[in-house]
Amino acid sequence: FTQVIAENEIVGTLLWSRGITITALLVALLSPIMGAVADRGGYRKVYLIFWTIICILGSFLLYFPQPSQVVFALIAFIIGNVGFEMGSVFCNAFLPDIAPKDKIGRVSGYGWSFGYVGGLIALILGLVLFINPEVPHFNLSKESFEHIRATNIMVAIWFAVFCLPTFLFVKQGKTDLSEKGMVVKDS
């Protein structure tokens, strides 16, 4: 982004940090409300799937921006990042359902560490398959940075595939359905 999409590294770094700030503000505003709605209405899994799809969509969209398409790239980044952060909120909400109270920290730590291992494996695959080869695989163009942009599609697919076990096998515990007006109070 800072070297190809933005006009220079200084402007690119400034704009990227603004994208992160916008993400943080959106997540800070959405998390309490969405969390209360999901907890009180019994929709944690639905929202986990929804926000994960938003994250995957944002990652996929990052393939398309060309040099100087700063706004498009930032919007795609913010979409993906908000999706990831909001998905994390709902993923964390499942911890009491899947781990005994005294093991929640350990299970959470394992989850994060497996996530980082998966991210490192995806990074290595991206480097080996797309970025480092002299002649990129899949006939991707180095001139238009397609070989680098394609890593976003790979990450979107990677994330989608490795989210499936969670979607299929993690069960949501019982929730207390909200009385009218309690969602606002709870948020």
Which residues are covered by each model-predicted region?
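Membrane-embedded alpha-helical bundles of multi-pass transporters/translocases
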Residues: F1-K171, L177-S178, V184-S187
